[in-house]
Amino acid sequence: MKTIYLCEKEQDLRRVFDTNDRIYCKADVLQSPEAFRETEYNFSTWGMPVFTEEEIKANLPKLKAVFYGAGSVQKFARPFLNCGVKVFSAWAANGVPVAEYTVAQIVLANKGFFRAMRYADRAKATELFRKYPGNYGVKVGIIGAGMIGKMVIRKLQDYCMEVLVFDPFLPDVTAAELGVKKVSLEEVFSRCQVVSNHLANNEQTKGMLHGGLFSAMLPYATFLNTGRGAQVVEADLIRVLTDRPDLTAILDVTFPEPPEEGSPFYKIGRAHV
């Protein structure tokens, strides 16, 4: 919280608001409602608790706005909106470092970095490097062309790569403007050297990425997940990584997060968590 809100421009924040920079949880609000009844603005981030409309009206009657220093507000926003409280999200700003991180991993993965870095022996590393195609003319798959997916696509335009996209909701005209080719989910996995997941976070996308897709990946391909861990059938991914020693997985997210103690992800050298 303090890193997000009270770092570079703390003085600006304090000029606008009489800021209390303590960190509170939902239990604090419910146990001492009198301390929060004059609160007009709330600053939160990942882990924002869910309040009912009744709890908001009873404990935060003067609340005007919630500032959420992260992405999606779907989990908690509706009761606040129904009470007339405005909700602001940093979803666009939050997407920038995610897109930058994604592109960096794609470039490194296409060069075989994540495999070769494990070898102190230069000859072995060089032999492994040769199994990877590099970044010139390579196919990269993007699953989900939402805000972050589009950011990644635009940043990849600086490279000579062919970008294949799976997104049923991406208009053909937008795909043409982005210079990408729309294909099926199966084609993304079977034709691309790196597959990067940016699916929307909802019930329909849970478990969408399964073993059949991972098994169809190209030799020495890489799966990169910065979307949501629950969108991957992780038992399938573990099985395929075990059966296919040529594949690599870069997992910025898992489910649960972090993986449970003893998870195979910690033991598979080609899974970077």
Q: What do the PLM-derived regions correspond to, one by one?
A:
Residues 115-151, 158:
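Glycine-rich NAD(P)-binding loop of Rossmann-like domains
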Residues 271-273:
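Conserved small/polar residues in nucleotide/adenosyl-binding loops
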Residues 1-41, 45-46, 160, 164:
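N-terminal glycine-/charge-rich "phosphate-binding" loop or analogous flexible N-terminal tail
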Residues 59-65, 82-85, 160-161, 219-221, ...:
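A short helix->loop->beta-strand "cap" motif at the edges of active sites that frequently abuts
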Residues 35-41, 60-63, 190-195, 218-221:
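Short acidic/histidine-rich motifs immediately flanking catalytic phosphotransfer sites
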Residues 47-52, 170-264:
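Rossmann-like adenosine-cofactor binding region
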